[in-house]
Amino acid sequence: MSIKSDRWIRRAAEAGMIEPFEPGQVRTAGGNRIVSYGTSSYGYDVRCADEFKIFTNINSTIVDPKQFDEKSFVDFKGDVCIIPPNSFALARTVEYFRIPRSVLTICLGKSTYARCGIIVNVTPLEPEWEGHVTLEFSNTTPLPAKVYAGEGCAQMLFLESDEVCETSYRDRGGKYQGQRGVTLPRT
């Protein structure tokens, strides 16, 4: 497996792998510095959309991944999401992905957030998966933390295999195939 470069990412985006796509790095908006997004040397920095689901314990339910209670979240739409101390929120990428059959995509958090105690987690994007990426933001601090919509939040790394997989995510009817918006756990 080899990591793919900015040139490869731009070509793949022209074929529809990432929409919308930013071919360079964006670091300012309206004259103000932002958390960067767009194509980097060996990755693509995704943006957080303005839809969030913020975890709450007001309903005192048990978190069960097999029978997840949607009442565990409060829906929020806005430019800035404030995550309560030691809590988390779900969001999604602005970008919609269509991963090629020979590619596995790994997501890593941005250091700007990590250095503030905000951790981004995303499981790998498997071959032939497509959809908006659901982002998990954990606020590991004892203070409220901000996440900015429309700005960079995580970096995707594209690894291409020297052999195409026998069975892709699409082939096996993956439960998150084609997801749009913030998607809760499914079994």
UniProtKB/Swiss-Prot annotation:
One of the GO biological process terms: dUTP biosynthetic process
Enzyme Commission (EC) number: 3.5.4.13
Enzyme class: hydrolase
Active site positions, chain numbering: 136
Signal peptide: none
Keyword Hydrolase among UniProt keywords: yes
Pfam families in alphabetical order: DCD (PF22769)
Gene3D superfamilies for the chain: 2.70.40.10
Positions of dCTP binding: 110-115, 134-136, 155, 169, 179
This protein's pathway: Pyrimidine metabolism; dUMP biosynthesis; dUMP from dCTP (dUTP route): step 1/2
Reactions listed under catalytic activity: dCTP + H2O + H(+) = dUTP + NH4(+)
Gene Ontology MF annotations: dCTP deaminase activity; nucleotide binding
UniProt cross-references to InterPro entries, sorted A to Z: dCTP_deaminase, dUTPase-like_sf, dUTPase_trimeric
Keyword Transmembrane: no
Keywords: Hydrolase, Nucleotide metabolism, Nucleotide-binding
UniProt-listed PANTHER family: DCTP DEAMINASE
Annotated family: Belongs to the dCTP deaminase family.
NCBIfam families assigned: dCTP_deam
Subunit-level organization: Homotrimer.
Function: Catalyzes the deamination of dCTP to dUTP.
Name under which the protein is recorded: dCTP deaminase
Phylogenetic lineage: Bacteria, Pseudomonadati, Pseudomonadota, Betaproteobacteria, Burkholderiales
Encoding gene, per UniProt annotation: dcd
